[in-house]
């Protein structure tokens, strides 16, 4: 039987990322053959990964990487936020995101086959990570954006990598592109322009907003405050010429009823019309980035800010860890009982 030295264990650990005891056991099992030990650990890792396949991985990190005219954002999940702070996990996220930016795969299946710097595929890297870290580790999703030489990328990660954003801007400098990425991280828009919002989506969101108004009005009634009116419209898409013309006539009728002199109406009407538009584009303000108040200067919208800069937002991607994943609710008492059987 071959003698297993500390040097052999160290080499195997460097090649596979395995723990000391796992590396030593593998070398013993294959009588010191290094290549067979690597294969042994690989198969063991696949078995461990298979056992963890049905677990919910909803924690983790986003990764952001820019390589010349290509940028990638990824979401890589673990089962606990504790593991997401592990140095090995953090390095894996960086390496995988870099590999995807450079390889430009079309989907997860293609990404799994990409080779990393150490020669392993992404798929094998996740199997190894699951085995060595001890939790299910998966690439949930990724997005790629490409730009031309005269465009600019903005890249930003928030809250230690819980949110990752990339932007593509035309006619802007790097600082503007990054500031807009920061805005998107904070405000979570879904589209660039209100034109991209689906009519059914606008109707659904308007109903939710009016439901919230109803709840607020119940509280206002308790303190004898005037109830807030329901929103009639939610997007500039719904503010047709006829709608705006009627709103203007209603404002004139209101001014007349209040006894305001006609000669000052022209000074009052524009402000009231803007208020009408602001009140009836709340869905736009929540979901369309160009309609949102700019977080660096809320006296203007993002659209107004970009116009001042002579810039245009071409595309953006925003990933937040765990979006849309139903997290498993742990029953710790049941878990303890199960372990005591």
Swiss-Prot record:
GO terms for cellular component: cytoplasm. It is found in: Cytoplasm. It holds the Pfam family EF_TS. GO terms for molecular function: translation elongation factor activity. Coiled coil: none annotated. It comes from the Bacteria. Its main location: cytoplasm. Keywords: Cytoplasm, Elongation factor, Protein biosynthesis. Residues 80-83 are annotated as: Involved in Mg(2+) ion dislocation from EF-Tu. NCBIfam families: tsf (TIGR00116). Belongs to the EF-Ts family. Associates with the EF-Tu.GDP complex and induces the exchange of GDP to GTP. It remains bound to the aminoacyl-tRNA.EF-Tu.GTP complex up to the GTP hydrolysis stage on the ribosome. This is Elongation factor Ts. It comes from Lactobacillus acidophilus (strain ATCC 700396 / NCK56 / N2 / NCFM). The gene is tsf.
């Amino acid at each position: 039987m071959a003698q297993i030295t500390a040097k052999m264990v160290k080499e195997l650990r460097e090649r596979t990322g395995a723990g000391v005891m796992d590396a030593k056991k593998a070398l013993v099992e294959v009588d010191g053959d290094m290549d067979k030990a690597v294969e042994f650990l690989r198969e063991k890792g696949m078995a461990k990964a298979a056992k963890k396949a049905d677990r919910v991985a909803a924690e983790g990190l986003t990764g952001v990487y820019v390589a010349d005219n290509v940028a990638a954002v990824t979401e890589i999940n673990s089962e606990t936020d504790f593991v997401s702070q592990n140095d090995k996990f953090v390095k894996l996220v960086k390496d995988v995101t870099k590999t995807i930016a450079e390889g430009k795969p079309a989907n997860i299946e293609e990404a799994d086959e990409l080779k990393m710097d150490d020669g392993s595929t992404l798929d094998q890297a996740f199997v190894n990570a699951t085995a060595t870290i001890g939790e299910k580790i998966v690439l949930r999703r990724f997005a790629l954006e490409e730009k031309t030489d005269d465009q600019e990328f903005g890249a930003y990660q928030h809250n230690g990598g819980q949110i990752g954003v990339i932007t593509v801007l035309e006619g802007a400098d790097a600082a503007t592109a990054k500031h807009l990425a920061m805005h998107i991280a904070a405000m979570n828009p879904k589209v660039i322009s209100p034109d991209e919002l689906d009519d059914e989506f606008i109707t659904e969101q308007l109903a939710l907003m009016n439901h919230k108004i109803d709840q607020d009005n119940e509280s206002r009634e308790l303190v004898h405050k005037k109830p807030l009116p329901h929103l009639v419209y939610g997007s500039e898409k719904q503010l047709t010429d006829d709608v705006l013309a009627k709103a203007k006539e209603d404002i004139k009728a209101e001014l007349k009823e209040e006894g305001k002199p006609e000669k000052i109406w022209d000074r009052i009407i524009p402000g009231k019309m803007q208020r009408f538009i602001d009140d009836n584009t709340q869905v736009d303000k929540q979901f369309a980035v160009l309609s949102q108040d700019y977080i660096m200067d809320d006296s203007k919208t993002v659209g107004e800010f970009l116009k001042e800069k002579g810039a245009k937002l071409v595309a953006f991607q925003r990933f937040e860890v765990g979006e849309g994943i139903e997290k498993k609710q742990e029953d710790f008492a049941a878990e303890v009982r199960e372990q005591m059987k």
